[in-house]
A protein has these predicted regions:
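C-terminal scaffold of the Radical SAM
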Residues: 4-172, 179-180, 228
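Auxiliary N-terminal substrate/complex-recognition segments of SAM-dependent methyltransferases
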Residues: 123, 136, 188-191, 217, ...
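Short amphipathic alpha-helical interaction segments
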Residues: 179-195
Length: 229
């Protein structure tokens, strides 16, 4: 029995066979109006079947939400196991990033990955970066507080639950001191989109409305810019 479903818009990636065919006129380019119509149809059909949207591109029956993806969208931690796997862990202590979150990428080649786990290989140098990681990890990216705030806005605002206004706070613990430029610009952006019926800012949370889902990327971009990130 299906308890969740996903529907993503088609993105034509550079360097693909489809991109070349679109460029030559052999295939039509994705059309935003067509996408909106199809999204409407999918949303209506899923709602009739007892599904609710919990992320812009994801629907589920009660209790059927994908917990794995929610960890990503809520800035949680996970460990990537296997060649080419990605992870994100929180580390504390001297030399670690402000947020403590570090993204990890394992070696793609299986032989290199297993060699790294055995204590050798190219990933061994990562351990000299002050991080207690296995040699299978070949890339790390430390997330600053601003990086984390940007991701929180980008990902959590796409959730039906939205995000708490306090999650827009910076390292000072507030979304901008009263009267500050950041606070004023953010308030103006929120007011504009709530006036258009695209955002719901009631209570202590900021949420996309059903109509706002279609313009989620633009709304998120404007909020991030207003925060100076």
């Amino acid at each position: 029995m299906c308890i969740r479903d996903s529907a993503y818009s088609l993105i034509v990636e550079d360097g693909t066979a489809m991109a070349r065919k679109v460029r030559r006129g052999e295939l039509p380019a994705p059309d935003e109006d067509t996408f909106a119509d199809r999204y409407d149809a999918i949303d209506a059909r899923l709602r009739q079947a007892g599904f609710s949207w919990y992320e812009v591109s994801n629907w589920a029956k009660p209790g059927g939400e994908c917990q794995h993806n929610l960890i990503y969208w809520r800035s949680g931690q996970w460990w990537g196991a296997g060649p080419g796997a990605h992870g994100c862990v929180r580390l504390r202590g001297e030399g670690h990033s402000e947020s403590g979150l570090v993204r990890l990428v394992n070696a793609k080649r299986p032989a290199t990955y297993w060699d790294g786990l055995a204590g050798g290989g190219e990933g061994a140098s990562i351990r000299k970066d002050g991080l207690p990681l296995p040699g299978s990890v070949v890339t790390t990216e430390r997330l600053s507080n601003d990086d984390l705030r940007t991701e929180q806005v980008m990902l959590r605002l796409r959730l039906a639950a939205g995000l708490e206004l306090t999650e827009l706070a910076g390292s000072t613990g507030s979304a901008g001191s009263a009267g500050s430029k950041e606070n004023t610009e953010l308030a103006q952006v929120i007011e504009r989109y709530t006036g258009l019926g695209l955002l719901d800012a009631r209570g202590e949370r900021l949420r996309l409305t059903d109509k706002g889902r279609y313009l989620a990327d633009g709304i998120v971009t404007d909020i991030v810019l207003a925060l100076g990130l």
